[in-house]
Amino acid sequence: IALDKDVLNKSYINFLRQGIKGWFEAMTDKPIVFSKSRSWAEFLPHTLAFDPNSKYLVILRDLRDIICSLDSLLWKYPQVVYDCDTPFYRLSFDERIKSYCRDTDSLLGRPLSNLPHVMEVAQKYSNNFFILRQEDFNEKPREAFQMIYQWLGEEYFEHDFDNIPKPDYYEHDTIYRS
């Protein structure tokens, strides 16, 4: 039985909406949820369809800093294998940069390849996106948070940056490939 394309699309969007709702309701009863998964960038047409008011905080970091950070981890943990025949640390710096930036299965390559799409969607849905340079966030976190709260339409909460509580649950960031 072939379904009408519009009915199928409406059903699919509702399926996604209910799945996401159930996912986050199982984790928290808080009215606002931040998901830091980079994977959302690959599904913006879907997420904007099931929640046209969804918000996307995009924090951009200087690419040079990211590469230096990745490379310092490589030298700190040379035993970690990266999908190649030659140990990754033995590749030239230029070859490593190419791998970091072009490998769409890597921590950097995948979000980097999605960045033009994210910026295009952010232009089209400018009220849904807040783009912030990580350097600005690091230098003036209080001001950055004030702008974020204002963008969200939420009352500002004064953060104590010297006493950040542990989260309610442990999130093992290393499980995220992208």
PLM features: what roles do these ranges have?
Residues 161-166:
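Acidic/histidine-enriched alpha-helical segments
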Residues 31-159, 174:
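PAPS-dependent sulfotransferase catalytic domain
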Residues 172-178:
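Short, intrinsically disordered, charge-balanced linker/junction segments flanking boundaries
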